[in-house]
Amino acid sequence: MSKRTFAVILTLLCSFCIGQALAGGIVLQRTRVIYDASRKEAALPVANKGAETPYLLQSWVDNIDGKSRAPFIITPPLFRLEAGDDSSLRIIKTADNLPENKESLFYINVRAIPAKKKSDDVNANELTLVFKTRIKMFYRPAHLKGRVNDAWKSLEFKRSDHSLNIYNPTEYYVVFAGLAVDKTDLTSKIEYIAPGEHKQLPLPASGGKNVKWAAINDYGGSSGTETRPLQ
């Protein structure tokens, strides 16, 4: 993969870094939330950029599988956001049984329901579009080893047969902004790697000599790129 192609991929991935937009004008001002364990809560600013339509916002936190609620509450869990207004969602931890030696990943869900106009005929058949988005929330304990900004550089890559083995020896999640082995783009094959995790991706028969990757930082931007010979 050429440097130009890799740069284009990073640009496209990071074009959403400023904020996560739902259709209809609702904008989450962050693409991820870092919950610092040393603080009592975290915040997620939200705005209604629309000119006319108020929205009813419903928010909650769930686990990675999306099937069970996480040990966090969001307040207010349900509220009306007028056109042109902004607000902030407060995320509060409700349990003390989370790992303290590594990051944990959860997801914040925000559902936006447009308010009906008073003039709308309640008996008329109509389609109401409900918009929903889901962003990552990292629970970060205090006193983790190493620097979070350096975690992505600590990843280990090894080739075995027709596979790329990826190891994360750090206590932080690393979210990929790009991954390629020579000219083979693997970005769509992996989203993130958890602390202490090992992942394996298939490689073409030709293998590859060099691995190039980039990560997404706490602010939703790119970390830059790193290139390393494959062992």
From Swiss-Prot:
Induction: Expression is negatively regulated by H-NS and subjected to cAMP receptor protein (CRP)-mediated catabolite repression.
Range of residues in the leader sequence: 1-23
Superkingdom as given in the UniProt entry: Bacteria
GO molecular function terms listed in the Swiss-Prot or TrEMBL record: protein folding chaperone
Statement: the UniProt record of this protein carries the keyword Amino-acid biosynthesis: no
GO CC terms: outer membrane-bounded periplasmic space
PROSITE patterns on file: PILI_CHAPERONE
Cellular location(s): Periplasm
GO BP annotations, alphabetical order: cell wall organization; chaperone-mediated protein folding
Coiled coil ranges: none
Null allele phenotype: Deletion of the operon under classical laboratory conditions does not result in any major effect on E.coli capacity to form biofilms compared with the wild-type strain.
UniProt keyword tRNA processing present: no
Keyword entries, A-Z: Chaperone, Fimbrium biogenesis, Immunoglobulin domain, Periplasm, Signal
Further facts: The operon is cryptic under classical laboratory conditions, but is functional when constitutively expressed.
Function: Part of the yraHIJK fimbrial operon. Could contribute to adhesion to various surfaces in specific environmental niches. Increases adhesion to eukaryotic T24 bladder epithelial cells in the absence of fim operon.
The family this protein is said to belong to: Belongs to the periplasmic pilus chaperone family.
Name of protein: Probable fimbrial chaperone YraI
